[in-house]
Amino acid sequence: MASSLGGDERSEIAFFDLETAVPTKSGEPFAILEFGAILVCPRRLEELYSYSTLVRPTDLSLISTLTKRRSGITRDGVLSAHTFSEIADKVYDILHGRIWAGHNIIRFDCVRIREAFAEIGLSPPEPKATIDSLSLLSQKFGKRAGDMKMASLATYFGLGDQAHRSLDDVRMNLEVVKYCATVLFLESSVPDILTDMSWFSPRKSPRTRSNGKLVANGVRESSTSSSSSPKTDPSSSSVDATIVKNHPIVSLLTECSESDASSYDIEDPIDITTLIGKLRIGTLQTDAAEEAKTVRQQDESPPSPDSDAKDESFLGVNEVSVSSIRASLVPFYRGSLRMKLFHNDTPLHLCWHSLKVRFGISRKFVDHAGRPKLNIIVDAPLDLCKILDAVDAAAHNLPTDSSTNSDWRPTVIRKEGFANYPTARLHISSESNGDDTLCGTQVYQKEEPLGTNQKLDVSSDNLEKLESALLPGTLVDAFFSLEPYSYQQMAGIRLAVKKLVILLKK
């Protein structure tokens, strides 16, 4: 595809956002309903161009339940819009070869764009670099705005309500970045005063690393002398460096601590002179989910159950009083809060024996890294349904400061026409170990009725072993925690299995 928008350098930053229809069935794709983007001058932070359009999905069944949203997007409006194939050239022209920016775009919008181009058989646009303001601001701004969603950040800075329309949201995104950068710029100017007043601690100055060094302002400096480039004017580069270094937005987007840099390999370090001269901001690929995962590991969690010992931290059916279940907001990370579920004053963890597997593991469903989702569906007994319904009620009704438009997903799954056959999804965790995928949940097999637990080692090389052990009709003892989540316009309670005992019949 030809790219005609803007100059040959394509130096503008493309802030973009998608509005989508949330899948109603497992494995169903997201349907893009709206695309919006602005091109921003990286030196003056001035909006140079804007574009937005509603998008009609090729599969209209994906919007069969779409009603008028608070944002104003309606089914009739979507039905009268162009399909993605009809706007693909325009989207490509806006995005290809530019720096991409947006909120949670690495995990969501970038993936949806690539899927949309793949669906129509075209090569997707490729970014020069990517700036994900969710992960970036979570690192640099310290989560002072709670969950760091766009709505929470806008409320924090008094920018009004999030419109949930693509063009409005990308403009708000730019304003949020400006505000955050200004606060960080002011704090860096008088750190002894302003950082003491803040609940965010300033980051340590980076130290020397291989393939170059990191200087005080956090920008990678090439170990190669600037004189080796015949096109570089050292004097002008010095002046440009001073100007750009002091720009709060550029400082925010290029600063990188030693701990950040060590989290991923940089195969081709960018020469600092080229970086400043052309204002090509380095790619930021740190995953906000990894940061949250680290915090969760440091936070209180149920001890790993022994293979045969009684697991006292996990409550059984006769040990739970529905009236004692409550949800509460507890301190999480750098001043933010998260929801936690309790039974009286103890974190709520459950064990349930002889649950029958309704649907086993399916390789059709994978996570963002391409790993199979090791989830199973089990029949939910009446007593378990009562407890999970009470958990849903406590969590769903907990007042929070940050507004959300997430759809609440009940923990107990009740299909139309099968109300008397409720089920629940158990999440078996998977962990990456290089090229291998390991099962993070402790899995055992046990011969009934008096057998001992035998550890089942599971990796991507022998995933069939776990699949064949969890066929429909199999009975399992499950020990699980209840973890509230709110992600990609969906919220609910995840049943995260810590230990799973597969019961074998003699």
Curated annotation (Swiss-Prot):
Pfam families: RNase_T
Active site: H164
Start and end residues of each stretch annotated as Disordered: 204-240, 289-313
EC numbers: 3.1.11.-
Database matches in SMART domains: EXOIII (SM00479)
Induction section of the entry: Regulated by the transcription factors NAC045 and NAC086.
GO terms assigned for molecular function: exonuclease activity; metal ion binding; nucleic acid binding
Biased composition (Low complexity): 222-238
Residue span, Exonuclease domain: 15-176
Functional description taken from the UniProt entry: Probable exonuclease that may be involved in enuclation of sieve elements.
Protein name: Protein NEN3
Native source species: Arabidopsis thaliana (Mouse-ear cress)
